[in-house]
């Protein structure tokens, strides 16, 4: 799909350099789109080559420990003070921010939705975002929000940055380009893209689809990082070399543009006369990236039992409590099931964490019916969940030969905070009223006598 989209896309003359990438996670990168535009040996020369301005973008306090200290130096056509102006407030009524506890009539329970309907009008990426849940408090930089999006139009002269958190974008249908201040990222389903807090970007479509649809985790807290592997060792899971950060690219155009900002849950816009994506060169470790979920190397039980789903963690955003995430991004990818004498699907569970799930393609092994690509489910803290009746029967009675679980890619945003449902999610027409019935066939088998029932 992406190859076709690349052939169809024609770069405008004012857009320098197409998408290219540097491998690694958390590296101190350096890249320039014009030769000699990146200063050597210092960060802030008295005068920069090409008449550029030097500017630092900090993603952490100056005094953060070296391992978590993040900043990038940008060399740009105009400083960022020229990329904003007199702001006026605007509204994106479907994008909500924690704390958000609206009144709605939907009772507590396990919930599942079919995909968002395709837009009936022209919507850009920003206009197509719909908040499903919020958790924590963006003002104190803890928690997250789970969004779904569906759009069908490009952000041509519109640009955006989010001061409230970083955005982890998970496409389900349709490839698109995220053009950030630091470069271009082409992303397609089965890939993810992360845009750091405060970084300007716009989204344009690639390919030919009726709708571009997917999911977003807005992380208010500490940034996503790779989980510790512990006794797994130095390899497997998400390997650092498979993360791709874009090379420098800039957009040099003089035309009326709009910069939109999300700040403490409110939205603001300013009119400017040029593109703000004007970084010609940069170096540092505060940068966007993408990752191909197909490169995740899963580990699992190779004799018996089903391990905890934490073994499928791609990225984790830590909290102040050791071993407890502000939010985890977990996937359930293709893998071999080989455990003996074992109920192989995920087991029945009640959990202190709250789980928002989506399906990128294929089927999810614990629920083969009703949970479709583009769909969503929510199992809040301490609400029981697990395989549906048909999944239980199939796994309980099937032959335990090695089976490859293929054509599947589900994911989960899991947070330590309860996820508060938005009114939009509670009243969404695709809410499956009969979801709770998927467990109704699980009847009592116990009769007080020993033996397998």
From Swiss-Prot:
The protein's superkingdom reads Bacteria
- Region of interest: Disordered: 1-43
Which residue positions are annotated as catalytic? 306 (proton acceptor)
What's one Pfam family the UniProt record gives for this protein?
HgmA_N
Q: What class of enzyme is it?
A: oxidoreductase
Q: In which pathway does it act?
A: Amino-acid degradation; L-phenylalanine degradation; acetoacetate and fumarate from L-phenylalanine: step 4/6
- Keywords assigned by UniProt? Dioxygenase, Iron, Metal-binding, Oxidoreductase, Phenylalanine catabolism, Tyrosine catabolism
Task: Show the InterPro entries listed in the entry.
Answer: HgmA_C, HgmA_N, Homogentis_dOase, Homogentis_dOase_bac, RmlC-like_jellyroll, RmlC_Cupin_sf
Record EC number = 1.13.11.5
Q: Which cofactor does it need?
A: Fe cation
Reactions catalysed, semicolon-separated, are: homogentisate + O2 = 4-maleylacetoacetate + H(+)
PANTHER family in the cross-refs:
HOMOGENTISATE 1,2-DIOXYGENASE
Q: What does this protein do?
A: Involved in the catabolism of homogentisate (2,5-dihydroxyphenylacetate or 2,5-OH-PhAc), a central intermediate in the degradation of phenylalanine and tyrosine. Catalyzes the oxidative ring cleavage of the aromatic ring of homogentisate to yield maleylacetoacetate.
What HAMAP family does its record include? Homogentis_dioxygen (MF_00334)
Q: Which family does it belong to?
A: Belongs to the homogentisate dioxygenase family.
* Protein name (database record): Homogentisate 1,2-dioxygenase
